[in-house]
Protein backbone atom coordinates (compact mmCIF):
# COMPACT_ATOMS: atom_id res chain seq x y z
CA UNK A 1 0.00 0.00 0.00
CA UNK A 2 2.80 2.34 0.93
CA UNK A 3 4.59 1.43 -2.28
CA UNK A 4 1.44 2.25 -4.29
CA UNK A 5 1.12 5.64 -2.56
CA UNK A 6 4.78 6.37 -3.28
CA UNK A 7 4.30 5.42 -6.90
CA UNK A 8 1.25 7.69 -7.20
CA UNK A 9 3.00 10.67 -5.65
CA UNK A 10 6.14 10.21 -7.70
CA UNK A 11 6.48 12.51 -10.72
CA UNK A 12 7.86 9.62 -12.78
CA UNK A 13 4.66 7.65 -12.31
CA UNK A 14 3.80 7.55 -16.03
CA UNK A 15 7.24 6.32 -16.93
CA UNK A 16 8.58 9.76 -17.84
CA UNK A 17 10.21 12.10 -15.39
CA UNK A 18 8.39 15.42 -15.06
CA UNK A 19 10.57 18.47 -14.52
CA UNK A 20 9.24 20.15 -11.40
CA UNK A 21 11.12 23.42 -11.35
CA UNK A 22 13.77 25.02 -13.53
CA UNK A 23 17.30 24.73 -12.27
CA UNK A 24 19.25 27.65 -10.91
CA UNK A 25 21.51 27.77 -13.95
CA UNK A 26 18.46 28.26 -16.17
CA UNK A 27 17.06 30.92 -13.87
CA UNK A 28 20.13 33.11 -13.98
CA UNK A 29 20.21 33.77 -17.69
CA UNK A 30 21.28 37.08 -19.09
CA UNK A 31 17.72 38.38 -19.49
CA UNK A 32 16.96 42.07 -19.15
CA UNK A 33 14.03 43.59 -17.32
CA UNK A 34 12.70 46.85 -18.68
CA UNK A 35 10.21 48.97 -16.79
CA UNK A 36 8.04 51.52 -18.47
CA UNK A 37 5.53 53.95 -17.10
CA UNK A 38 1.99 52.93 -17.89
CA UNK A 39 0.19 56.04 -19.08
CA UNK A 40 -3.57 55.85 -19.29
CA UNK A 41 -4.31 56.56 -22.92
CA UNK A 42 -7.60 58.19 -23.62
CA UNK A 43 -9.65 55.94 -25.81
CA UNK A 44 -10.17 57.28 -29.32
CA UNK A 45 -13.66 58.48 -29.96
CA UNK A 46 -16.26 55.98 -31.04
CA UNK A 47 -18.14 58.74 -32.83
CA UNK A 48 -18.21 58.21 -36.60
CA UNK A 49 -18.06 61.98 -37.19
CA UNK A 50 -14.93 62.96 -35.24
CA UNK A 51 -12.57 60.02 -35.76
CA UNK A 52 -9.71 59.96 -38.22
CA UNK A 53 -11.66 57.94 -40.80
CA UNK A 54 -14.76 60.05 -40.41
CA UNK A 55 -17.75 59.38 -42.55
CA UNK A 56 -17.98 62.09 -45.16
CA UNK A 57 -21.53 63.36 -45.37
CA UNK A 58 -21.17 64.16 -49.08
CA UNK A 59 -19.88 60.69 -49.90
CA UNK A 60 -22.76 60.05 -52.29
CA UNK A 61 -22.14 63.27 -54.23
CA UNK A 62 -18.45 62.79 -55.06
CA UNK A 63 -16.78 59.42 -55.22
CA UNK A 64 -13.17 60.68 -55.40
CA UNK A 65 -11.91 62.90 -52.60
CA UNK A 66 -9.10 65.31 -53.39
CA UNK A 67 -5.64 64.66 -52.00
CA UNK A 68 -5.80 67.73 -49.76
CA UNK A 69 -9.06 66.63 -48.20
CA UNK A 70 -8.93 65.51 -44.60
CA UNK A 71 -11.90 64.45 -42.53
CA UNK A 72 -12.23 67.95 -41.14
CA UNK A 73 -12.02 69.92 -44.39
CA UNK A 74 -13.63 67.90 -47.14
CA UNK A 75 -12.53 69.49 -50.40
CA UNK A 76 -14.59 67.37 -52.76
CA UNK A 77 -16.28 69.05 -55.67
CA UNK A 78 -19.58 69.22 -53.82
CA UNK A 79 -18.18 70.46 -50.52
CA UNK A 80 -16.09 73.39 -51.82
CA UNK A 81 -18.43 74.95 -54.33
CA UNK A 82 -16.39 78.15 -54.51
CA UNK A 83 -13.22 76.12 -55.24
CA UNK A 84 -11.62 77.76 -52.23
CA UNK A 85 -9.43 74.71 -51.57
CA UNK A 86 -8.15 74.25 -55.12
CA UNK A 87 -4.53 75.20 -54.36
CA UNK A 88 -2.84 73.51 -51.45
CA UNK A 89 -1.44 76.78 -50.09
CA UNK A 90 -4.82 78.46 -50.25
CA UNK A 91 -6.41 75.46 -48.55
CA UNK A 92 -3.93 75.69 -45.69
CA UNK A 93 -4.59 79.40 -45.29
CA UNK A 94 -8.33 78.85 -45.44
CA UNK A 95 -8.09 76.11 -42.83
CA UNK A 96 -6.14 78.43 -40.55
CA UNK A 97 -8.70 81.17 -41.02
CA UNK A 98 -11.52 78.69 -40.43
CA UNK A 99 -10.06 77.51 -37.13
CA UNK A 100 -9.36 81.04 -35.90
CA UNK A 101 -12.73 82.41 -36.93
CA UNK A 102 -14.48 79.32 -35.64
CA UNK A 103 -12.99 79.76 -32.19
CA UNK A 104 -14.08 83.40 -32.17
CA UNK A 105 -17.57 82.53 -33.35
CA UNK A 106 -17.94 79.83 -30.72
CA UNK A 107 -17.14 82.40 -28.04
CA UNK A 108 -19.44 84.96 -29.65
CA UNK A 109 -22.38 82.59 -29.90
CA UNK A 110 -21.88 81.60 -26.27
CA UNK A 111 -21.83 85.25 -25.25
CA UNK A 112 -24.91 86.14 -27.26
CA UNK A 113 -26.84 83.28 -25.73
CA UNK A 114 -25.42 83.90 -22.25
CA UNK A 115 -26.52 87.53 -22.17
CA UNK A 116 -30.03 86.54 -23.14
CA UNK A 117 -29.99 83.75 -20.56
CA UNK A 118 -28.90 86.17 -17.85
CA UNK A 119 -31.72 88.54 -18.79
CA UNK A 120 -34.20 85.67 -18.68
CA UNK A 121 -32.95 84.67 -15.24
CA UNK A 122 -34.01 88.11 -13.95
CA UNK A 123 -30.47 89.36 -13.46
CA UNK A 124 -30.84 93.11 -13.95
CA UNK A 125 -28.32 93.75 -16.71
CA UNK A 126 -28.65 97.17 -18.26
CA UNK A 127 -26.98 96.05 -21.48
CA UNK A 128 -29.38 95.18 -24.26
CA UNK A 129 -29.49 91.91 -26.15
CA UNK A 130 -26.87 91.18 -28.79
CA UNK A 131 -29.13 92.66 -31.42
CA UNK A 132 -29.44 96.14 -29.95
CA UNK A 133 -25.97 96.34 -28.37
CA UNK A 134 -24.38 98.17 -31.28
CA UNK A 135 -26.84 101.04 -31.06
CA UNK A 136 -26.39 101.34 -27.30
CA UNK A 137 -22.59 101.14 -27.30
CA UNK A 138 -22.05 104.35 -29.25
CA UNK A 139 -24.16 106.43 -26.84
CA UNK A 140 -22.18 108.07 -24.04
CA UNK A 141 -21.90 106.25 -20.71
CA UNK A 142 -23.84 103.26 -21.96
CA UNK A 143 -21.23 100.56 -21.49
CA UNK A 144 -22.04 99.81 -17.84
CA UNK A 145 -22.01 96.04 -18.22
CA UNK A 146 -23.31 94.97 -14.83
CA UNK A 147 -25.66 97.96 -14.40
CA UNK A 148 -23.60 99.12 -11.43
CA UNK A 149 -21.42 102.14 -12.19
CA UNK A 150 -18.74 101.11 -9.69
CA UNK A 151 -17.89 97.74 -11.30
CA UNK A 152 -17.01 98.02 -14.97
CA UNK A 153 -18.05 101.38 -16.31
CA UNK A 154 -16.39 102.72 -19.43
CA UNK A 155 -17.32 106.23 -20.49
CA UNK A 156 -16.03 105.81 -24.03
CA UNK A 157 -16.42 102.95 -26.46
CA UNK A 158 -13.24 104.23 -28.14
CA UNK A 159 -11.24 103.57 -24.97
CA UNK A 160 -12.54 100.00 -24.86
CA UNK A 161 -11.67 99.59 -28.52
CA UNK A 162 -8.11 100.87 -27.98
CA UNK A 163 -7.58 98.49 -25.04
CA UNK A 164 -8.86 95.59 -27.11
CA UNK A 165 -6.51 96.42 -29.96
CA UNK A 166 -3.50 96.57 -27.61
CA UNK A 167 -4.35 93.39 -25.69
CA UNK A 168 -5.29 91.28 -28.70
CA UNK A 169 -2.32 92.62 -30.65
CA UNK A 170 0.04 91.55 -27.86
CA UNK A 171 -1.50 88.08 -27.58
CA UNK A 172 -1.51 87.54 -31.34
CA UNK A 173 2.09 88.78 -31.56
CA UNK A 174 3.17 86.23 -28.94
CA UNK A 175 1.19 83.53 -30.76
CA UNK A 176 2.91 84.21 -34.11
CA UNK A 177 6.41 85.34 -33.11
CA UNK A 178 6.98 83.81 -29.69
CA UNK A 179 7.92 85.76 -26.61
CA UNK A 180 7.82 85.40 -22.82
CA UNK A 181 5.06 82.77 -23.12
CA UNK A 182 7.41 80.34 -24.86
CA UNK A 183 8.59 79.58 -28.36
CA UNK A 184 6.13 79.00 -31.18
CA UNK A 185 5.87 75.45 -32.47
CA UNK A 186 2.57 75.70 -34.33
CA UNK A 187 1.05 79.18 -34.61
CA UNK A 188 -2.45 77.82 -35.15
CA UNK A 189 -2.39 75.59 -32.05
CA UNK A 190 0.28 77.26 -29.87
CA UNK A 191 -0.12 75.12 -26.73
CA UNK A 192 2.04 75.96 -23.73
CA UNK A 193 0.61 78.97 -21.90
CA UNK A 194 -2.17 79.15 -24.47
CA UNK A 195 -3.36 75.70 -23.34
CA UNK A 196 -3.80 76.08 -19.57
CA UNK A 197 -6.11 73.04 -19.31
CA UNK A 198 -3.59 70.73 -21.01
CA UNK A 199 -6.12 69.60 -23.60
CA UNK A 200 -3.47 69.08 -26.29
CA UNK A 201 -1.10 66.79 -24.39
CA UNK A 202 -2.53 63.48 -25.62
CA UNK A 203 -2.04 63.43 -29.42
CA UNK A 204 -5.08 61.27 -30.14
CA UNK A 205 -7.44 63.40 -28.07
CA UNK A 206 -5.83 66.51 -29.58
CA UNK A 207 -6.49 65.34 -33.14
CA UNK A 208 -10.10 64.60 -32.27
CA UNK A 209 -10.51 67.98 -30.55
CA UNK A 210 -9.19 69.74 -33.67
CA UNK A 211 -11.92 68.14 -35.77
CA UNK A 212 -14.57 68.91 -33.17
CA UNK A 213 -13.38 72.51 -32.93
CA UNK A 214 -13.70 73.08 -36.67
CA UNK A 215 -17.08 71.34 -36.93
CA UNK A 216 -18.58 73.06 -33.88
CA UNK A 217 -17.02 76.35 -34.98
CA UNK A 218 -18.75 76.12 -38.35
CA UNK A 219 -22.03 75.50 -36.54
CA UNK A 220 -21.35 78.46 -34.25
CA UNK A 221 -20.53 80.79 -37.16
CA UNK A 222 -23.72 79.79 -38.95
CA UNK A 223 -25.84 80.08 -35.79
CA UNK A 224 -24.37 83.50 -35.00
CA UNK A 225 -25.38 84.59 -38.50
CA UNK A 226 -28.84 83.21 -37.73
CA UNK A 227 -28.98 85.16 -34.45
CA UNK A 228 -28.26 88.39 -36.34
CA UNK A 229 -30.91 87.70 -38.99
CA UNK A 230 -33.45 86.83 -36.29
CA UNK A 231 -32.67 89.99 -34.38
CA UNK A 232 -32.98 92.15 -37.51
CA UNK A 233 -36.37 90.62 -38.34
CA UNK A 234 -37.92 90.18 -34.89
CA UNK A 235 -35.97 92.60 -32.72
CA UNK A 236 -35.49 89.88 -30.08
CA UNK A 237 -32.57 87.78 -28.94
CA UNK A 238 -32.16 84.08 -29.78
CA UNK A 239 -33.52 82.70 -26.52
CA UNK A 240 -36.61 84.94 -26.63
CA UNK A 241 -37.30 83.79 -30.19
CA UNK A 242 -36.88 80.17 -29.11
CA UNK A 243 -39.29 80.64 -26.20
CA UNK A 244 -41.85 82.33 -28.48
CA UNK A 245 -41.53 79.54 -31.03
CA UNK A 246 -41.91 76.80 -28.42
CA UNK A 247 -44.94 78.57 -26.95
CA UNK A 248 -46.76 78.70 -30.30
CA UNK A 249 -44.84 76.79 -32.99
CA UNK A 250 -47.51 77.23 -35.67
CA UNK A 251 -47.67 81.03 -35.61
CA UNK A 252 -44.22 82.05 -34.34
CA UNK A 253 -41.80 80.74 -36.93
CA UNK A 254 -39.76 81.93 -39.88
CA UNK A 255 -42.66 81.64 -42.33
CA UNK A 256 -44.78 84.07 -40.34
CA UNK A 257 -42.07 86.71 -40.79
CA UNK A 258 -41.19 85.70 -44.34
CA UNK A 259 -44.74 86.35 -45.52
CA UNK A 260 -44.87 89.58 -43.56
CA UNK A 261 -42.86 91.72 -45.97
CA UNK A 262 -45.14 93.38 -48.51
CA UNK A 263 -43.43 95.71 -50.99
CA UNK A 264 -44.41 99.31 -50.51
CA UNK A 265 -45.53 98.94 -46.91
UniProtKB/Swiss-Prot annotation:
Membrane topology qualifier: Multi-pass membrane protein
Residue sites binding chlorophyll a 4 per the record: 216
Residue numbers binding chlorophyll b 5: 164, 261
Post-translational events: Photoregulated by reversible phosphorylation of its threonine residues.
Cellular component aspect of the GO annotation: chloroplast thylakoid membrane; photosystem I; photosystem II
SUPFAM superfamilies (UniProt xref): Chlorophyll a-b binding protein (SSF103511)
Transmembrane keyword on record: yes
Binding residue positions for chlorophyll b 2: 152, 181
Function description: The light-harvesting complex (LHC) functions as a light receptor, it captures and delivers excitation energy to photosystems with which it is closely associated.
Domain-related comment: The N-terminus of the protein extends into the stroma where it is involved with adhesion of granal membranes and post-translational modifications; both are believed to mediate the distribution of excitation energy between photosystems I and II.
Subunit structure: The LHC complex consists of chlorophyll a-b binding proteins.
Protein name: Chlorophyll a-b binding protein 1A, chloroplastic
Organism lineage: Eukaryota, Viridiplantae, Streptophyta, Embryophyta, Tracheophyta
